[in-house]
Regions:
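Flavin-dependent oxidoreductase catalytic cores
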Residues: 1-361
Length: 361
């Protein structure tokens, strides 16, 4: 019988256990969107987690939508991340990075040149986002990408994946979830194109599959995973018929043999069943490693693995607040709660970032 704390073979790498740190935006990058010394410490503290998926990292300057999020499109960023991966590996850990294009989420005011964000269609998200000096503001109406521009965005993902390997990461996770660019192309609530990237399910999935094809060709399918969120409403994500859409996506991904599928089962931080969806039907369409996420407790995670529902279970806030998460889960010890006097995003010092306590030795 499988156990959450047993080693697991993920493509060419062996994980010490089946616990995964989900990608968690912290907005802690330094000048030039380069990871700094505190980021090195933050991830190294969590190296006992079977697999770390480092925070969403933009694939280009125009892919950014929030302050102080790291990139993987300059030599300085690659060098900064190399310090992180070297430190994690020195502690015996394994680390992927999530590659990200925010799409329509940033307001025009966020960009110094006033450039509109890009999206599949010129449909603003009914959501708010943070702009330094202004607080929470409405998302702007994006500009629809021209058909001829899309190949360039695909290439940005390919280049960032190569940069990730050069930075020492064990692999990458493509961010295909939560209303960002790839997810926005998938959904009829945000994609009303009339070219080969819109309309039918096959057309709306084309961009995602082109990104996955390019990235797997560049660095190998055994180093590429993808995250999907079929029914999460975050960032005004909407789709009239998600079941056939995501069944098609998973069938096509099966042909590309990614090293894992990372599925958010519901609305993160909210009800797990916020919309009806048959996740077991998806699972049956994919023969590879199945990773699950969405508020799993210790007991739920154990049951998911022992029952065969999942191969790996990712944790968000528990990994953020508990650098020794695996030990706490194994010993059924209490988990740290988020500090009440600090948020999850931003900051310049260790508080709320690298000062969460470990269990006593």
């Amino acid at each position: 019988m499988s156990d959450l704390f047993q080693p697991f073979q993920l493509g060419p790498i062996t994980l010490a256990n089946r616990v995964v740190m989900a990608p968690l935006t912290r907005s802690r990058a330094e000048a030039g969107n380069v990871p700094g010394p505190l980021t090195v410490e933050y991830y190294t503290q969590r190296a006992t987690i079977g697999l770390i998926i480092a925070e969403a990292t933009q694939v280009s300057a125009t892919a950014q939508g929030y302050p102080n999020t790291p990139g993987l499109h300059t030599a300085e960023q690659v060098a900064g991340w190399r310090k992180v991966t070297d430190a994690v590996h020195a502690q015996g850990g394994k680390i992927f990075v999530q590659l990200w294009h925010v799409g329509r989420m940033p307001p025009t005011a966020y960009h110094p040149d006033g450039q509109a964000p890009v999206a599949p269609s010129a449909i603003a998200a009914k959501a708010k986002t943070f702009v330094p000096g202004q607080g929470m503001v409405d998302c702007s109406t994006p500009r629809a990408l021209e058909t001829a521009e899309i190949a360039g965005v695909v290439n940005d993902f390919r280049t960032a994946a190569r940069n990730a390997i050069d930075a020492g990461f064990d692999g990458v996770e493509i961010h295909g979830a939560h209303g960002y660019l790839i997810d926005a192309f998938l959904r009829d609530g945000s994609n009303q194109r009339t070219d080969q990237y819109g309309g039918s399910i096959e057309n709306r999935a084309r961009f995602l599959l082109e990104v996955m094809t390019a990235v797997t060709a560049e660095i190998g399918a055994d180093r590429v995973g993808i995250r999907l969120s079929p029914v999460s409403p975050v960032n005004d994500s909407s789709e009239s018929n998600p079941q056939p859409l995501f069944e098609y996506v998973v069938r096509e991904l099966e042909k590309l043999h990614p090293v894992f599928l990372h599925v958010v089962e519901g609305h993160t931080g909210g009800p797990r069943d916020n919309a009806p969806f048959d996740y077991d039907a998806l699972r049956k369409l994919y023969s590879g490693v199945w990773m699950v996420n969405n508020g799993y407790s210790n007991t739920m995670a154990q049951e998911a693995v022992t029952s065969g529902h999942a191969d790996l279970v990712s944790f968000g806030r528990p990994a953020l607040c508990n650098p020794d998460l695996v030990r706490r889960l194994k010993e059924n010890a209490p988990l740290n709660e988020p500090f009440a006097d600090t948020g999850f995003y931003g900051g310049s010092g260790p508080h709320g970032y690298t000062d969460y306590p470990f269990l006593p030795a």
